[in-house]
Amino acid sequence: MRWLLLMMPLAGCLDVEADFKLGEDEVITAETRMILGRQLYDMLQLAPQAQGLCPAEAEKVEGPDSVICTTRDMSTLSEAIAEAEKARGEDPFMGDVEIVRVDDETVRLVLPLDFENIEGRPAELSADNPMFEMMADGLEGAEIVVRFSALEVLESNGAVSEDGTSVELVVPTVELLEPSGTLPDAFTAVLKYRECGLLGC
């Protein structure tokens, strides 16, 4: 999310779709599909520190107006928890993300959505920027979609699937520039990812 915010002034179109699946073995598989405006993608090639939006190893489909970047990754639940804890003291953008084990079967996620009060918001994303309105207009219709899947979604303020195994968060990309106040302060979900018997997991 950090580089997404920092590079927003360069975006003519930015759609993001990310899927995270937490398995019974505590392995998280992630697939992220990002549609970048051609101008943004070309600018990224000149800013090595920002290329995490579409890294060299990403699967790319390039067109005259946009580039589709698909990345896949695997990590463990313990690694994700450690990363969130590290960010808490180092990164003002991601410091409010929470990944907490509830017990041996479930995990609780909290993703902050209070974009109005993000600490360290870049000056380019303020209404003082003469290009602000043009940037906001260019992002109309673009969305950030994040899905979490596990054995069962026990509770969430997101959209839970009919089979109860996944939950979806949809954020209009323009919310990062012009928060409407219609989003909750945070997205929360409690996911059950395995069944443990009397003898443990």
Residue locations for each model-derived region?
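Sec-dependent signal peptide recognition
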Residues: M1-M7
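Buried hydrophobic packing residues in well-ordered domains
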Residues: A18-F20, E26, V146
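Post-signal peptide N-terminal segment of mature Sec-exported envelope proteins
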Residues: L22-D42
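Post-signal-peptide N-terminal segment of Sec-exported extracytoplasmic proteins
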Residues: I35-K60
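Mature, soluble, non-transmembrane domains
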Residues: V61-C201
